[in-house]
Amino acid sequence: MLAIENYLILSAILFAIGTIGVLTRRNAIVIFMCIELMLNAVNLTFIAFSRHLGNIDGQVFVFFVMTVAAAEAAVGLALMIAFFKNRESIDVEDVNLMKL
């Protein structure tokens, strides 16, 4: 069985990759996937602490986070489709043009 430190290190690496992706990418879909990666890193931390402490509360909280993430994905993808139909691009720098 792996120690909790291994799970936390993996979670920190995944969160860092997601953060770098959000800060450096311009494609909305890639940014969206990086945000989901960050959410999954946090979920991994909740599961690791829940297992380490022998408490099921963290696992229950992960189910709620996954439900909210699924709703966020549906709304986010719908917004991206609407934006693509309007501008023929999903570059985040083009979002400012929606004000016109």
Curated annotation (Swiss-Prot):
It is an enzyme of class 7 (translocase). Keywords: Cell inner membrane, Cell membrane, Membrane, NAD, Quinone, Translocase, Transmembrane, Transmembrane helix, Transport, Ubiquinone. It is a multi-pass membrane protein. Pfam families: Oxidored_q2. Its main location: membrane. It catalyses: a quinone + NADH + 5 H(+)(in) = a quinol + NAD(+) + 4 H(+)(out). It is found in: Cell inner membrane. One of its GO terms (biological process) is ATP synthesis coupled electron transport. HAMAP family: NDH1_NuoK. Belongs to the complex I subunit 4L family. This is NADH-quinone oxidoreductase subunit K 2. The lineage of its organism: Bacteria, Pseudomonadati, Thermodesulfobacteriota, Desulfuromonadia, Geobacterales.
